[in-house]
């Protein structure tokens, strides 16, 4: 994985989720604050980080920062992937692409999103998703700029943020940010809402496993990895949903 230097979540969650026989290795790009300037400076370090990982002869690389890519607009995820693959000739997954592909695999066209970002960066992500063909029915963002502060959150914060979304018209719920801890609450949230709930990290891992041909279900971390609910339309396979809460923040508008 290639992660921001201040990311303390992605490696921890991946090591918890991946089955035996796999090992996780990472290289870091310097970034402390989630600002446009810092994100661009960080992104310029991606090839150096990929070269370091290539020395370990890894099978697949995951670029683990959603907002650094989506804030640059639709198509930049492909730019990042091609840049890394051209440099090291290793299959590469970009988190932004993985999230879109995972939502499509679930049959989700309408989503509600929980994020930790500042409002400006959050809206850049929502625009990216809309341009990829998704409808945003609701969102909530926490306005946090310091990346370590996001990593220090309990997974319960992600859960409460998701619970505050108006999910009545959603096909799936997304916890967006590789630094926002959430793996331990995904199954619980699916049971409460009756909807697929995925995170940037579970989508990235799902896509990386697909790139290397691994298709065995992984249980305990949401239906995307377990295969319990293979589409948003199949959400009746999950436990009975509870009534959605009143939204804290209104539906997204341009």
Locations of regions flagged by a protein language model:
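Glycine/small-residue-rich loop that forms an oxyanion/phosphate-binding "nest" at active or ligand-binding sites
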Residues: 50-97
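Short, glycine-/small-residue-rich phosphate/pyrophosphate-handling segment
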Residues: 1, 105-127, 213-235
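Hydrophobic alpha-helical
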Residues: 160-192, 204-205
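Short, well-structured alpha-helical segments in soluble
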Residues: 43-56, 157-170
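Short, flexible loop segments at boundaries between secondary-structure elements
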Residues: 144-149, 195-217
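Periplasmic-binding protein-like
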Residues: 59-64, 112-114, 170-177
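N-terminal glycine-rich anion-binding loop in soluble enzyme alpha/beta folds
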Residues: 2-48, 117-154
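Conserved beta-alpha
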Residues: 80, 84-145
